[in-house]
Structure formats: C-alpha cells, structure tokens
C-alpha cells in the first residue's frame, strides 16, 4: 500500500490549505469551491471520491477549523454519493453545487447509550420514523439529515412535522442537537434503497478518522513550533530531553492515527473489507488522541490554557469526536469482539 497523496489528493490539499490559511470559516470553504468537490460532475461539482474528501477533512483538522465540514462532507455527501440514486442526489446535493449559498448536510447516527449502532433503536415502519438521536451536528442549519433506523436509511428535513430539536453543549462550541422523531412521515423517494446503518457508520468513522488525523497532526505541529521558539534558561524548550521525549510520544500517536485513517479510506474506496481497520482506528482515536492533546497543552505551559490560542480548538474538538465514537472502553469492546469472532 502506498499512502502518499495522489496528484488529485495533493491538488485538493493545496486548495483547502490556500483557503484555510486565509480564513477558517465555513463560508470561506464554500466560496473556495471546497464543498462542491465531491458533488457529481453532472450537478456542477468535481466528482472526487472518498480519498479526496478524507484529504479535505484532514486539512481542515490540521488547521483546527471548526466548521460543518465533517457533518456536511464526511457524514452527508459521502453517504449520499455511495447510497443514493441519481434522482435523490440531484435533490439532496443541490445546495452544495458551485454558485449555491452553501448548504449544510448532517447525519443522525448516535442514540442514547449507543454510539454508531448498526442496529438502531429508531424505527421505520410503514413510512413512519420514530426515535431519538443524539449528538447531531448542525441539525438546525441543515437542509437534510441522513437518519439510520432499524430497517432503512432515510433522509429527512429538519423542518418536517414531528421533528423536535434540543440544542446540547459541546466542548468546541459548535452546534449540536438531540433530535426526536415522532411518527415523522417519510416518502418512498426519501428512502436510500439498499442503505444500511452499518455502511453509513463505516463511512462516518472513516470521515471522523480523517478529521482526527488532521487535528492531532496540527496540534503536534503547533506544539513543536512553540517549544522550538520558547526559551528557558537561555535554551529552546525543544532541546530539553524530557520535552523531546514527550513530543516523540505525540508524534508516534499521530503517525499511528494517520496510518489507520488512510488504511480505512483505502480499503473502503477499493471495496475491501475494512471492519478490523475501522475498529482499530476508532479505538486508537478514542484512547490516544485526547491524552496526546493533554501532552500538547502541558508543553505549552500557561499559553495552552488560553481559549483564544489555537490549541484549544484542537483539544476540544478531539474531546467531541471521542464522545461521538463512544469513548475508549466502548471502542475496545468492539476490537475485542472482532478478535473473538475471528
């Protein structure tokens, strides 16, 4: 496996970097054409695939950008391109084409006590959707929500009758909601034929992995630059053995997450079995990303406690992603289940 960026991925990375180096906002990504990259060419997009979307998310994470990029591109567009018919894509992706105002998509996947469940408690019976989803990013702003249910994957408007939203707190301050569906009517044309919660969860975890990869790499770069320039006793902090050793631990975790994230994306894009790699990726993010962020904070000293300093965005977002994945104990249970089944 060669995990070097392809020419297309490098071009995508260059575009995202050029945008985010100037402005970290969602509108900047929209104006820069980034949101249209995975939209099919017939709709005015560039038609790039999962590896390129992962590149977008990694670069967004590397810059510490807190935007609807993960929800829209990673949880929304990727699943629709994979599962929706052309007619459905034409409707649901209309807000992301070049020249549009910048639509937002999201996915309602998690449930109370269940992170990315392959067998959701949310029910879909006779065209009616009922259940509760938690941790739904940007639900109120979204044009459409992809919802996993016990027997189908459906697309619902947040404004549909029977949809109730309550905003819930996040570490990084981004918008997140608990969404309750009370006998919501869903047309046959809004059901993703052949869609299954397991597939949607696979794609979602791959997207989260790409974003987390960038977040840890960005925090590592920020910290390495800080200790190289911050002097103590007349010497850069980076020359102290303990500092160098701690930074090396962050580097090891960063490289491992990068390897796992890219392996998952490669396997999914090639149609290979990715379940084992996905479980390893989920566990490594949930168990290692937050601790190495703590190390980065520690190496920044008092500067790391300033919420206006970029380090705060990296750490707080990783905390939210860890919660989305269900935490380290849950992810370790999934790894153990894979080992026992094999």
Model-derived segments and spans:
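Anion-binding (especially nucleotide phosphate/pyrophosphate-binding) glycine-rich loop
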Residues: 60, 65, 74-76, 97
């Amino acid at each position: 496996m060669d995990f070097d960026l392809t020419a297309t991925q490098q071009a995508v990375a260059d575009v995202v970097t050029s945008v985010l180096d100037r402005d970290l906002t969602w509108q900047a990504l929209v104006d820069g054409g980034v949101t249209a990259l995975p939209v099919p060419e017939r709709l005015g997009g560039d038609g790039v695939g999962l590896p390129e979307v992962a590149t977008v998310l990694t670069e967004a994470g590397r810059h510490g950008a807190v935007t609807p990029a993960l929800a829209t591109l990673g949880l929304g567009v990727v699943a629709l391109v994979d599962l929706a018919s052309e007619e459905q894509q034409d409707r649901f992706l209309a807000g992301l084409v070049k020249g549009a105002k910048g639509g937002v998509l999201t996915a309602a996947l998690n449930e109370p006590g269940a992170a990315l469940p392959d067998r959701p408690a949310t029910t879909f019976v006779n065209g009616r959707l009922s259940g509760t989803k938690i941790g739904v990013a940007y639900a109120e702003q979204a044009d459409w929500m992809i919802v996993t249910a016990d027997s189908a994957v459906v697309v619902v408007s947040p404004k549909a009758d029977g949809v109730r939203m309550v905003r819930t707190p996040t570490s990084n301050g981004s918008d997140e909601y608990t969404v309750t569906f009370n006998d919501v009517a869903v047309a046959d044309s809004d059901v993703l034929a052949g869609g299954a919660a397991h597939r949607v969860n696979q794609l979602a975890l791959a997207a989260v992995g790409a974003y987390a990869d960038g977040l840890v790499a960005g925090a590592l770069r920020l910290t390495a630059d800080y200790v190289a320039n911050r002097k103590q006793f007349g010497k850069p902090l980076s020359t102290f053995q303990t500092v160098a050793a701690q930074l090396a631990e962050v580097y090891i975790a960063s490289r491992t997450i990068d390897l796992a994230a890219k392996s998952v994306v490669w396997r999914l894009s090639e149609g290979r079995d990715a379940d084992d790699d996905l479980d390893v990726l989920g566990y490594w993010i949930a168990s290692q990303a937050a601790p190495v962020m703590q190390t980065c904070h520690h190496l920044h000293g008092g500067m790391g406690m300033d919420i206006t300093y970029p380090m705060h965005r990296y750490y707080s977002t990783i905390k939210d992603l860890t919660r989305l994945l269900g935490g380290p104990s849950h992810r370790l249970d999934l790894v153990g289940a894979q080992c026992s089944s094999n």
